[in-house]
Regions:
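Extracytosolic ligand-binding ectodomains
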Residues: 1-520, 524-547, 554, 558-567
Length: 572
């Protein structure tokens, strides 16, 4: 294959797809071509959506900038969603320790990945002399790609990798054209505090994506006086039966407020099973994080039905005529790209992909506005016998051009100067029927609001009064759940009761004649006690134990209290 000119650029968008077609954005023979590698997982919702969006972005950009002397050319590849962690370790061994053999890997998918994906990636880097990589979709893929970027010194740009554990601190060529998952934790914790819930159970997938948000989430919840008595960790390979067993376990606990942080496929199984076991009934609270909330419109209708009553935290996308027009065109294009698939709803990931291409194309033109002197070194990779180009000048120049470019795109204010997008506004949604409705908005500056007014110059929005719209909770209830219930098992607090000789209106107790072992109690003291228990921020199961002080003249109230003391002493 003939190599592209030294000024070429590869934007490797790691999402996964099996296509090796170059999408040329121009017919101008005089334009400098910058080759962009696109690796997508088109078996996923986001991957399919992204391919359509980025293709349209290239076409739209150069239709609006016909005088530009640079052009991006996309080269689509397929990673098939394989595990990039094994490949990252293999490349580290091959490059840093010059090993001649690798034992394993353990999984066949890892082996296929090492031979397929590594070759695809390094082939693109070698043959097209790339200067940037866009992607990947998964955090595990991103770790692998940042290793490649560190070898070749090219930027990695991902608009879907939200894991907080992947930062630019140790990966200077990594840019996150999406949010960091940790940016949503304060909005979630504020939501818990707003409704007065005191205990929360996170349910998350046992991967880097699932685990990495937890420390920041726990800190935010603690700062809002909410306890986390238990964490439900779902293995990535969990079966439906295992998920059902975990749900039954949660039902035995008093907490009824759950925060779900996992991939949309696993969340679909979780909520389907939760519906089956009765955990989507009245009294339960479910909150899904950004990863699931952003894809609500593309989930199966049966899953949406199971999720009815849940809340979601997403990133607000400002409405605009440009967005409306693009959505219409995108729907038509998506049907053409995927004639055998049901129509997906365009999500913020597709918009970020579109805006990322515009940012890259603009940066390419800016970086090439002056004549470059390109110095390229090569590092041989033992596994593939391919050479990885190492940029020492233009990679940094291109990176700086991206960092300096700010604009208002389809997704809103697009600014990577901090090496990742900073969401200005989070949107709280309530899943109802076959869709969702707005509950309100949250900003770090103003907290909650029902509506947003005019935007500020920095992309943030002015909010209205600090309140939220009504919610239809699980079980079609409009009453705010208290967040806890008496557990189905466990010890109960035994409350001794007796009858007052002269004042039965103060306290009266007797054994229930219909139920063996049951004690009936009434009176002012009982009413005060039961009302106090109701106001506790947690469940306190209890039962009355009758103590007769009237039948035995030698017994007295003092004896009754002393018996309580003796029982406590024996317990100690």
């Amino acid at each position: 294959m003939e190599k592209a000119p030294p000024g070429a650029i590869l934007l490797l968008m790691l999402f996964a797809h099996s296509c090796a077609v170059a999408l040329n954005a121009t017919n101008d023979p005089g334009a400098d071509e910058f080759h962009v590698g696109v690796i997508l997982d088109l078996g996923s919702l986001v991957g399919k959506e992204a391919r359509t969006s980025i293709s349209m972005a290239v076409e739209d950009f150069y239709a609006s900038h016909k005088n530009y002397r640079t052009r991006l050319v996309l080269h689509v590849r397929d990673s098939r969603g394989n595990n990039f962690q094994a490949a990252s370790a293999a490349l580290d061994l091959l490059n840093n320790y010059n090993v001649k053999a690798i034992i394993g890997p353990q999984k066949s998918s890892e082996a296929f990945f090492m031979t397929d994906i590594a070759n695809i990636t390094l082939d693109l880097l070698n043959n097209y002399n790339v200067k940037a990589i866009i992607g990947p979709q998964k955090s595990s893929e991103a770790f692998f790609m940042t290793d490649i970027a560190n070898i070749s010194e090219v930027p990695v740009i991902s608009f879907t990798t939200t894991s907080p554990s992947l930062t630019s601190d140790n990966n200077p060529y990594f840019l996150r054209a999406t949010i960091n998952d940790s940016t949503q934790v304060n909005s979630i914790a504020s939501l818990i505090k707003y409704y007065g819930w005191r205990e929360v159970v996170p349910i998350y997938i046992d991967t880097d994506y699932g685990r990495s948000i937890i420390p920041d989430l726990l800190e935010a919840l603690q700062g809002n006086d909410a306890r986390v008595p238990y964490q439900s960790i779902i293995p990535q390979s969990a079966t439906s039966e295992q998920i059902t067993q975990e749900l039954y376990k949660l039902m035995t606990m008093q907490t009824r407020v759950f925060i779900v942080h996992m991939t949309s496929p696993m969340a679909s199984v979780l909520f389907t099973k939760a519906k089956e076991v009765g955990m989507m009934d009245k009294g339960y609270v479910w909150i899904v994080t950004f990863g699931v909330a952003s894809l609500i419109g593309s989930l199966n209708p049966s899953v949406l039905e199971a999720m009815n009553g849940a809340l979601g935290v997403g990133v607000y996308v400002p409405k605009s005529t440009e967005l409306d027009n693009f959505t219409v065109r995108w729907n038509t294009r998506f049907r053409m790209d995927n004639p055998n698939d049901p129509l997906l709803k365009l999500s913020i990931f597709g918009l970020w992909g579109y805006d990322t291409i515009w940012a890259v194309a603009q940066a390419v033109e800016k970086a090439k506005s002056t004549k470059d002197t390109v110095q390229i070194q090569h590092m041989t990779n033992s596994m593939t016998s391919l050479k990885v180009p190492k940029e020492t000048e233009n990679g940094l120049k291109f990176l700086n051009a991206i960092l300096q470019y700010k604009f208002r795109g389809l997704s809103g204010y697009f600014d990577l100067s901090g090496r990742q997008l900073q969401p200005s506004t989070f949107q709280i949604i309530n899943i109802v029927g076959k869709g969702w409705r707005d509950v309100g908005f949250w900003t770090a500056q103003d907290g909650f609001s029902q509506r947003l007014t005019r935007p500020r110059s920095n992309g943030t929005y002015l909010s209205t009064k600090p309140d939220l719209n009504p919610v239809i909770w699980p079980g079609e209830s409009t009453n705010i759940p208290r967040g806890w219930e008496i557990p189905t098992s466990g010890k109960k607090l035994q409350v001794g009761v007796c009858t007052s000789d002269g004042y039965p209106e103060y306290i009266y107790a007797e054994k229930d004649p219909l139920i063996v072992g049951m004690t009936k109690a009434s009176g002012l003291a009982i009413e005060v006690f039961e009302e106090t228990v109701k106001r506790l921020p947690y469940a306190l199961p209890y039962e009355y134990v009758f103590y007769n002080t009237t039948e035995n003249i030698s017994s007295s109230y003092d004896d009754f209290v002393y018996q309580v003391y003796l029982k406590a002493s024996k317990t100690l």
